[in-house]
Amino acid sequence: MSKLKELIEKFCPNGVEYQKLDDILDYEQPTQYIVKSTEYDDSYNTPVLTAGQTFILGYTNEEDGIYKADKDSPTIIFDDFTTSFHWVDFDFKVKSSAMKMLRPKSTFEGSFKYVFYAMECIHFEAVNHTRHWISKYSQFEIPLPHPEVQEEIVKILDRFAEYAAELQAELQARQEQYEYYRDKLLTFNEIGGGYSRCNMDENE
């Protein structure tokens, strides 16, 4: 944090400017990337994504119309109706046209990942069932400090995101361990070579 403070004092002595997302990001419609068949199988290679909570709906073996993304050229998938979004750095197809793929404009000189994190700070509740990116969401402004400040913020937040993912994985593993032993301990016919059921007589 001390390095971040130094960078802010160096590059942002008078505060930071704000820019609209519309001035930072371009969007692409998903039409050509929509999956044709919903017969998914985990043995297939290409994930089918939704920008909602489920994220990965399944995997397809379709080879055409795959959206190309990787670590060096990621994208943000944005649900045009709910305004939920995800960071994606792998190839994929999509389930429906209810999303947009966002990438930085060629003129943007900052950190795309910083923009993603800044978007997570936008508090907007989608009430009406209508598309929101063009009419509303893209008009929100985010702070844009010097690129070096952006990069340092991303490093810090990436580190915390990694910690959170590790904790979540640990919690999931502990939950599965708990359920295993709970079921094992409460299945008495598997303990001590079996058991006999006893009927209780209230008069005894």
Specify the residue positions occupied by each region the protein language model found.
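Charged, alpha-helix-forming regions
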Residues: 1-204
